[in-house]
Amino acid sequence: MKMLKKGTAVLFVMIMAVMLVACGDKEETKTYTLSQNGVDSKLTYTYKGDKVTKQTAENTMSYASLGVASKEDAEKMLKATSDKFQGIDGLKEKIEYKDDKAIETLEVDYTKISSEDMNKIPGMSSNGDTSKGISMEESAKMIESQGYKEVSK
């Protein structure tokens, strides 16, 4: 009987340890910005520990930076690229056209998107094996090397 109580106590302690570790990582965000060639880009990463769970990109592009003169010309130019983002589970993309600029919002939910679909996304770059998740630390290094600056909270 004592052996059963010891076994139960050990099992209980192990379960509690696993639960504490699982609950230990809280979700956080980091935001980075870059202005280059008439495009203002804002990247927001949502992550737990070192694992990125979601990335949102907001790109504001003046029509002049796209080499077009009007909203209609911008729509024609960007439609083919925008169409490539549609219908992928874990990915949302939309473009809002204003009088003098287009605002693209792209959201990648890494808990839903497959690594195969992720590799198909135009303009998406990564280092290493993405099937095991996306590292926040490695993502920060990569985008900072491209000129992005972290926004202080």
Spans of model-derived segments:
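Subset-of-secretome marker
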Residues: 25-153
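C-terminal motif of bacterial Sec signal peptides marking the signal peptidase cleavage site
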Residues: 19-22
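Bacterial N-terminal signal peptides that target proteins for export
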Residues: 1-11
